[in-house]
Design a protein with these regions (language model features):
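Active-site-adjacent loops and short helices of periplasmic peptidoglycan-processing enzymes
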Residues: 11-160, 164-173
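Single conserved hydrophobic/aromatic residue that forms the stacking wall/gate
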Residues: 1-10, 14
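Short, well-ordered beta-to-alpha junction loops that form the rim of enzyme active sites
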Residues: 5, 147, 180
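Extracytoplasmic
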Residues: 163-195
Length: 195
């Protein structure tokens, strides 16, 4: 169900949410594509965890959600305790469905990396797919260097490009269902019992 926002309502959002302090912003009616408010649409910004939208879309489009995926050392070696994570360990077996849900609901960097290697064989190969998809979608101000959004000066996007990606992602039924989930409990794995 789409909610339409009047222009005056967009102005109210601007005032209430202190959007004026954002480096860049875009408020868009997703159904029509009409821009209700924008600020520095094409200014380069760091996407952080919104990167995971692209990772999820590639997993949903290229993967089989029933696949059992084994977490590898290569997928997990760059994840730190300070990162958002699910606590995946080398050798953990989860389905691709569990990984995508965990990545989107918990913003789990470890899940993003495990997904990337499962889909493309390596993090670098997956990043190539991310950049190809960005170009296909017309995201001309975007360049990815990792699947989880870890900061890197060469990992960037724009508010306009994030709107393009978000609008595309919301057309995917599975993606839409996952991002509506307020919480996701991962069932028992080969290494962890379910609580």
């Amino acid at each position: 169900r789409s909610t339409r926002v009047r222009s005056s309502a967009a102005s109210d959002v601007y005032k209430r949410q202190n959007v004026q302090y954002a480096q860049s912003a875009l408020l868009m009616d997703m159904a029509s594509g009409r821009v209700l408010y924008s600020k520095n649409l094409d200014e380069r910004v760091y996407p952080a965890s919104t990167t995971k939208i692209m990772t999820a879309i590639l997993a949903l489009e290229m993967g089989n959600m029933d696949d059992t995926v084994t977490a590898t050392y290569d997928a997990l070696k760059s994840i730190t305790l300070e990162d958002s994570h699910m606590g995946i360990l080398t050798g953990d077996e989860l389905t691709l469905d569990q990984l995508v849900k965990g990545m989107l609901v918990y913003s789990a960097n470890d899940a993003a990396n495990v997904i990337a290697i499962h889909i493309a064989g390596s993090l670098d190969a997956f990043v190539d797919l991310m950049n190809q998809k960005a170009q296909e979608l017309g995201m001309t101000g975007t360049h990815f260097v990792n699947p989880c959004g870890s900061h890197d000066d060469n990992h960037y996007t724009t508010a306009r490009d994030l709107a393009i990606l978000s609008k595309y992602a919301m057309k995917n039924d599975q993606f839409r269902e996952i991002v509506k989930m307020p919480i996701y409990k991962i069932p028992a794995t080969n290494k962890y019992a379910s609580e």
